[in-house]
């Protein structure tokens, strides 16, 4: 994302044979500042990924105990491990989308066809969607912690982060 912006601005100035204007430099400085916020959020989510996934799964299974009961979709260690793995993969691709500022990597490499795969396997997409929403709550709480991150208003970024989780939940529901 940032690299493309820098390349575009420099190429435009170069094609006109001009130095970068103060406005262009300010805009690029803002891109860096916003990029630092993205890095902070991704770093926090990544550093806490295991906890986010585990706690989301635990909360999901408390709400929907039939999933881990005999005959449930997460019953047996193998199925439980597959559930946790899938939640972790979805979270990982959400962090890629946050970093890029673009949902296409999430859609193209993770979500496209996921609902159909779950349907074919008999996995309840609505339960996966609940798990994703629980990961969203945890990730946003972690991302909103003001300690040790780039200062500034992050409300737009947090809304964007929430939208990636919502997109993932809608894709599997």
UniProtKB/Swiss-Prot annotation:
Keyword Transport found: yes
Subcellular location, principal: membrane
Keyword annotations from UniProtKB, A to Z: Antenna complex, Bile pigment, Chromophore, Electron transport, Membrane, Methylation, Photosynthesis, Phycobilisome, Thylakoid, Transport
Residues found modified as N4-methylasparagine: 73
Any one GO cellular component localisation term in the record: plasma membrane-derived thylakoid membrane
Binding site for (2R,3E)-phycocyanobilin 2: 154
Processing and modification events after translation: Contains two covalently linked bilin chromophores.
Endpoints of the signal sequence: none
InterPro entries: Globin-like_sf (IPR009050), Phycobilisome_asu/bsu (IPR012128), Phycobilisome_asu/bsu_sf (IPR038719), Phycocyanin_b (IPR006247)
PANTHER family: C-PHYCOCYANIN BETA SUBUNIT (PTHR34011:SF7), PHYCOBILISOME 32.1 KDA LINKER POLYPEPTIDE, PHYCOCYANIN-ASSOCIATED, ROD 2-RELATED (PTHR34011)
Subunit-level organization: Heterodimer of an alpha and a beta subunit. Heterodimers further assemble into trimers and the trimers into hexamers.
Full protein name: C-phycocyanin beta subunit
Organism: Mastigocladus laminosus (Fischerella sp.)
């Amino acid at each position: 994302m940032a690299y493309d912006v820098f390349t575009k601005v420099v190429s435009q100035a170069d094609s006109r044979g001009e130095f970068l204007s103060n406005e262009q430099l300010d805009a690029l400085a803002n891109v860096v500042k916003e990029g630092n916020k993205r890095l902070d959020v991704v770093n926090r989510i990544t550093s806490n990924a295991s906890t986010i996934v585990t706690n989301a799964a635990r909360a999901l299974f408390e709400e929907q105990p039939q999933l881990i009961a005999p005959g449930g979709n997460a019953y047996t260690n193998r199925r439980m491990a597959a559930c946790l793995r899938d939640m972790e993969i979805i979270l990982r691709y959400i962090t890629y989308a946050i970093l890029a500022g673009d949902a296409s990597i999430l859609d193209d490499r993770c979500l496209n066809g996921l609902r159909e795969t779950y349907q074919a396997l008999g996995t309840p997409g609505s339960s996966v969607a609940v798990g994703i929403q629980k990961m969203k709550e945890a990730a946003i709480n972690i991302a909103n912690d003001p300690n040790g991150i780039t200062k500034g208003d992050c409300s737009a970024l947090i809304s964007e982060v929430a939208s990636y989780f919502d997109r993932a939940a809608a894709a599997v529901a």
